[in-house]
Every structure is written in C-alpha cells, then in structure tokens.
Amino acid sequence: MRGVWVSYIELDMQNETDKSEASFREKFKNIAINSKNAGFNTLIVQVRPFCDALYDSKFFPYSHILSGEQGVNPGYDALEVMCEVCSQLDLDIHAWVNPYRISTDSTPQALSETNPYVIDNEIGEETENGIFLNPANKMARNLIIDGVTEIVRNYDIDGIQFDDYFYPTQDSDFDNTEYADYVETVGEMNCM
C-alpha cells in the first residue's frame, strides 16, 4: 500500500461558494488524480472528524465540513462520491475515523441537536482542549463500534483507519467514575 491521508481540511466545503455535489466531486477528483499521479494507490479519507459524518449516518449528524453547519444535509453523500471516484481511478479507499473527538475549542462552532454528545452528555467529557467521547464509557465505545460497522456495511471501502485515539487529557478526573467501576468489577490487583 502506498497511501496518503486526506484530512477534513482538504475536503472542507465551508468557504466554497458552490457547495454542491458536483463541486465536491470535482474537488475530490482533483485530490485523487494528483495522488495517483504522485504514485499513491490508496486514499485514507477523514469521514468522521468531529463526532459527525461525511456520509449519511443514523448515529452521527452531517459534518459542518460539507455545509458550514453541523447537522445540515448537504444534499449528497460525500463518502459515496469518494468511493465512486476512487473506483473509477482504480484507487483503494480507507475510511479514517477520529473515534473520540467531538470538538476542539473552536471547531465546529456549534454542535447539532442530533450530535450524540448533545443527546447524552454522559458519553463525553469537556477538557481544556475541547469535548471528547470518553473511551472508558461503555455507551461511547458502543457508539464508535456502531459507527464503524455502519461504514463497513454501507460503503465499498478497503479499510478503516483510526487517528487521535489517545486520551485527550492527563487529568485523572476524566474517567474517575468509570475507573472506580472497573476496580470494583475486576479488582485492585488487575489495575495498573
């Protein structure tokens, strides 16, 4: 595999005057052609950057990357478009998921009312760096699994990539409750 990461920054349509499917397709096709011409055979595209989706999801709202506002349907499925373009150019495509990040201190500007954290803030934690799903929380882990399963079942992708999968803070309060439950269930001897 000779892969290249295509981040949400390269896919961003927020400042484009034309946010249509045709405009997105042209933007992505240029990325794909340039990557292929540079000798790459795989694109690793960021499809879930902020607990949102660049595809039609029953678990996550549409990403603000496509329309400028999280939760607003752009009128097309960006992942489907990217899969089609990669297939036409004989490129593999991997879906890149940021499993924990909900927001940074500035992005997105507002969370959709359908964002999983807005629906149930018990699944995440606010830190000085933003809001993140808590990987010690069972509901958060299940949400991540459900989201990846949804991608694998619904799209012709060749792989899943995780990035930014580390804890967002060193503060032990981040998962204190879950850790106490773990110690109670597993026992002190099995804890680091």
Task: Name each model feature, range by range.
Residues 2-6, 43-45, 93-95, 160-162:
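Hydrophobic faces of well-ordered beta-strands that scaffold small-molecule active sites
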Residues 5-26, 83, 93-154:
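Active-site-adjacent "subsite" loops/lids of carbohydrate-active enzymes
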Residues 10, 49-51, 99-101, 166-168:
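Active-site-proximal loop/turn and secondary-structure-junction residues that shape catalytic pockets
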Residues 15-17, 47, 55-58, 104-109, ...:
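Short, solvent-exposed loop/turn and secondary-structure capping segments
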Residues 19-38, 65-89:
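Aromatic- and glycine-enriched glycan-recognition loops and surfaces
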Residues 26-53, 154-159:
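Catalytic domains of carbohydrate-active enzymes, especially glycoside hydrolases
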Residues 38-74:
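Aromatic-lined carbohydrate-binding/catalytic grooves of carbohydrate-active enzymes
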Residues 41, 89, 118-192:
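Polysaccharide-binding and catalytic clefts of secreted carbohydrate-active enzymes
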